Amino acid sequence: MALENKLGITNSAELAREEERISKRKAVELFESGALDKLAPGRFTSLQAIHKALFEDIYDFTGELRTVNLAKGNFRFAPLMYLEAALGNIDKMPQSTFDEIIEKYVEMNIAHPFREGNGRSTRLWLDQMLKAGIGQVVDWSRVDKEDYLLAMERSPIKDVEIKVLLKAALTDDVNSREVFMKGIDHSYYYEGYTTFKTEEL
């Protein structure tokens, strides 16, 4: 059964295709309009704006805090009763060095504030923080899917793996359209969305 959506789609495979197509196009608009650079780096309100921009044509809940508890495998994300407090604490975390930025990213992943689309939104949010803080972004096309997912799974206990993995993929090409497009495709590939190439939408 598909998640309730504005498109009236009840088939989950069909919804996944449309979600990929529409939200990838929205990601391109975010980049090309310069809207990403206008958001305050590292703030939850900025993550909300990114999430809303990507998914507002598909879901009613975009940018809104989830109303259910979420888990992935054996890992439970921040319980609802602590979610708002967790987000307040994340906003206050420092973000002036690479390590601080990744630690903030890991905490936001644990918070998982939205019902759907957390990973894709948060990777854009991370790059925006890196760009503002250290003048670099992640070239996601250089980050292996299995290595990334495993490192993120372990990151709540030990964040050294995700730091090493992402540090090795940093690039100074912060305004490169090609790096951004490839990054979107890889970000979606991590979540199993591989039907469309961003460049062709």
Q: Model-predicted segments: where are they?
A:
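FIC/Doc superfamily catalytic core
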Residues: 1-201
